[in-house]
From Swiss-Prot:
Lineage top rank: taxon: Bacteria
Family stated for the protein in its record: Belongs to the D-glutamate cyclase family.
InterPro entries membership: D-Glu_cyclase, Putative_hydro-lyase, UPF0317
The protein's name: Putative hydro-lyase Arad_8587
Sample GO molecular function, one term: lyase activity
Record-linked Pfam families: D-Glu_cyclase
Organism, as annotated: Rhizobium rhizogenes (strain K84 / ATCC BAA-868)
Lineage: Bacteria, Pseudomonadati, Pseudomonadota, Alphaproteobacteria, Hyphomicrobiales
Length: 268
């Protein structure tokens, strides 16, 4: 966990403004929004499942790097004082018995079904996109104003308690000459997935067609570019599906919680 005291004087207006827009009903992928602020995936579970997930995350830190865990029944986080986790993401998913039951812009009603929900905020690779762009590496889904493509792989996560599932990865096409740079830059952010888990050869990790991601939108891959894959915080949603979790609330893939924490706080 990062030390928060020295961050109290950071100007967080961009992050607050984005969250206010989402609370008012704006729906959009958050890649490229409030650049410079850490974004987080989210999964919310009844207390009975919280330890299983905490153990799952501990055993699979590349895919599930935990940034914060709430107290049971709380809908707040120290990563953004004053924010409401029920309302301040652009889009939520509600899961019942391992199946997607609904998507909503306000999770208050679903949240009220269980008095003891525990929220987990998980590092997101959007956090290191800003330094990659600053280094001159194009991020295609930002250029095209689309969602990042995400794929379910054949890479099994370590099970924990009642939870099991395979890793989900995000993909960014990178010019061959810049792959090492992309790996170096992202590798400096181990708390938000870190360096790539796979480069090229998508079939080796069970991806049959890059044009058909399980989550998000497909993106163009230009000549001379290589698909580069990072562990992804949608992995918990794959575990919800594979494990038949009775109830969960998550972010919708690509629609993150924007924190008040600067990206630089997670720079190793």
């Amino acid at each position: 966990m990062i030390a928060l005291d020295h961050l109290r004087h950071v100007n967080v207006e961009a992050a607050r403004t984005a969250r206010a827009r989402y609370r008012a009903g704006t729906v959009e992928p958050t890649s490229g929004i409030a650049p410079g602020f850490t974004q987080a995936n989210m999964i919310v579970l009844p207390r009975d499942w919280a330890f299983d997930f905490l153990l799952y995350a501990q055993r699979n830190p590349r895919a599930c790097p935990v940034l914060d865990v709430s107290d049971p029944g709380s809908h707040t986080t120290l990563l953004a004082p004053g924010a409401d986790l029920r309302k301040d993401l652009p889009l939520y998913r509600v899961w019942r018995d391992g199946k997607l039951a609904e998507e909503t812009t306000d999770a208050t009603a679903a949240w009220g079904e269980h008095p003891d929900l525990v929220s987990f905020l998980i590092g997101c690779s959007f956090t290191f996109e800003t330094p990659m762009v600053e280094a001159g590496i194009e991020i295609r889904h930002i250029t095209d104003r689309s969602n990042v493509p995400m794929y379910l792989t054949n890479k099994a996560c370590r099970p924990a308690g009642r939870l099991r599932g395979n890793m989900v990865v995000s993909m960014r096409p990178i010019p061959a000459s810049r792959v090492a740079d992309a790996a170096t830059i992202s590798g400096r952010f181990p708390a938000v997935h870190g360096a790539p888990v796979h480069v090229g050869a998508p079939e080796e990790i069970g991806i049959k067609d890059l044009a058909k991601p399980e989550f998000g939108d497909p993106v163009r891959i230009e000549p001379g570019e290589i698909p580069v894959f990072w562990a992804c915080g949608v992995t918990p949603q794959a575990a919800v599906m594979a494990s038949g979790v009775p109830f969960a609330i998550t972010h919708a893939p690509g629609h993150m919680f924007i924190t008040n924490i600067p990206d630089s706080a997670y720079h190793a």
